[in-house]
Structures are given as structure tokens and as C-alpha cells.
């Protein structure tokens, strides 16, 4: 064992990201992907059918469902959420000082 101090993080995103801004974006992408995945599961369709419904290829949907979020921009996920019939709302507040 080493005597190096243990670093703690507020969330998994803070641990993975290099900056707080990047962590926030990763968290938002994960939330959108989870909601889209839940919507797709509720359709009871094959991945190919669900992908067609979303306007993407089956391999692309598979990436989304497997959590390969680095392959999706926030904009793309927002568009997919809308195609999945989800209402995406944005709330803007002042950050804590």
C-alpha cells in the first residue's frame, strides 16, 4: 500500500472528466441516453425497427444502448430524444459562487 492521499469526487462524472464543464456535459449526455434507452425498450421493437423509428442505423442505436456516449454529441442526443417522443426541457440558473 502507498501513503498517497485518496482523491474523492462528487460524482463519477467529476472523476472521469478533466474539467467541471466536461463533467456536466457528460452527465447531461448520460441522462438523455438513459431516457432514450428507456423509451426504446418500451416500444418492444427490434433494434433495427427502433433505429429506423429514430432515423439512425442499428449499429448506432446499439452504441447508444451500450453507453458509448463519447460517440454522441449533446445536440444529437437531444434530437434523438425528441424523435423518441420525449420532451426535453432546459432550465438555466445562476451557478453557485
Where are these regions (language model features)?
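N-terminal flexible/basic segments that precede or flank functional cores
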Residues: 1-34
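Amphipathic alpha-helical interface surfaces
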Residues: 28, 32, 57-60, 73-76
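Short basic helix-loop element that most often maps to the first helix and adjoining turn
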Residues: 32-49
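Short alpha-helical DNA-recognition segment
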Residues: 45-62
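DNA major-groove recognition helix of helix-turn-helix
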Residues: 65
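DNA major-groove recognition helix of helix-turn-helix/homeodomain DNA-binding modules
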Residues: 74-90
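Short, charged recognition helix plus adjacent turn
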Residues: 92-97
Amino acid at each position: 500500500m502507498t501513503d498517497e492521499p485518496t482523491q474523492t469526487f462528487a460524482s463519477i462524472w467529476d472523476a472521469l472528466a478533466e474539467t467541471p464543464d466536461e463533467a456536466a456535459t457528460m452527465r447531461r449526455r448520460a441522462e438523455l441516453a438513459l431516457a432514450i434507452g428507456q423509451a426504446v425498450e418500451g416500444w418492444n421493437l427490434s433494434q433495427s425497427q427502433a433505429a429506423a423509428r429514430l432515423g439512425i442505423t442499428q449499429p448506432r442505436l446499439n452504441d447508444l444502448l451500450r453507453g458509448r456516449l463519447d460517440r454522441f454529441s449533446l445536440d444529437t442526443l437531444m434530437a434523438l430524444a425528441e424523435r423518441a417522443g420525449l420532451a426535453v426541457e432546459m432550465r438555466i440558473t445562476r451557478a453557485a459562487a
